[in-house]
Amino acid sequence: MKRQNEEVKREFTVGFQPIYPAQRLSHHSLNRIIHEPSASKVAYCGFAVDAGTRDELENEQGMAHFVEHLIFKGTAKRKAWHILNRMENVGGDLNAYTNKEETMIYSAFLTEHFGRAFELLTDIVFHSTFPQREIEKETEVIIDEIQSYEDNPSELIFDDFEDLIFRGHPLGRNILGNPGQLKLFRSEDAAAFTSRFYHPGNMVFFVLGNLDFRQVVRWAEKLLADLPAVAGYPSGTRHDWQPGI
């Protein structure tokens, strides 16, 4: 097991190429770019945002996952269906998921469509508008998702176990939130959450594919140069550990 872990660590480190704003991306503060070369014709890229359930305030339970849904529902220049079709039209895929510690927004595509994927990801991650009508729709979608989990004992038992272990700590919360809190969310709440966490200094951009690293950097400089230079990690989002049992 130890040898296997060492191999995984070695393989990851080989593809890890950090970007330091003062040297490369002087107009903003993208925390890292991770580039893993591959000979495959299919490539992947995305943003790993350092924000999950653990970072939610008491009145934001479920917000990290909620925002993950909402970023697909419209930006300043795209409607929801434009977002969904942008990669599907060239045989690509766009997806996301949330866990207790981070949110991943990513795309799979043929290598020649890297620019299209990167531009779309940048648009939804940094320029989502959170229309109130879409919030109301997604609230019902997520409540249905919660109810489906509650009908599945094998899933529910893990939530109960984490609640017991991390009692009183945000890590013990259900990633999906609770119906009562979800119904209170408004557009400005989603905007406030993303303003704290969805900035370059709090995320990593990752690329896997047959792409030159310098090409990736050029695209990053082009697409991210106009973003505000907010550096580092948000304050007040980490919590002292305490045993639940």
What are these regions (language model features)?
Residues I34-A39, G46-A48, V230-I245:
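His/Glu-based metal-binding/catalytic segments typifying zinc-dependent metallopeptidases
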Residues K2-R3, E7-V42:
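N- or domain-start disorder-to-order transition segments that initiate the globular core
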Residues Y44-A108:
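M16/MPP (pitrilysin/insulinase) zinc-metallopeptidase core fold and M16-derived inactive scaffolds
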Residues L25, I33, C45-F47, I105, ...:
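Well-ordered beta-strand positions enriched in small/hydrophobic/aromatic, beta-favoring residues
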Residues K2-E7, A80-W241:
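Charge-rich, well-structured scaffold segments of protease-associated domains
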Residues S38-A39, G52, T75-A76, L110, ...:
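Solvent-exposed coil/turn segments that connect beta secondary-structure elements
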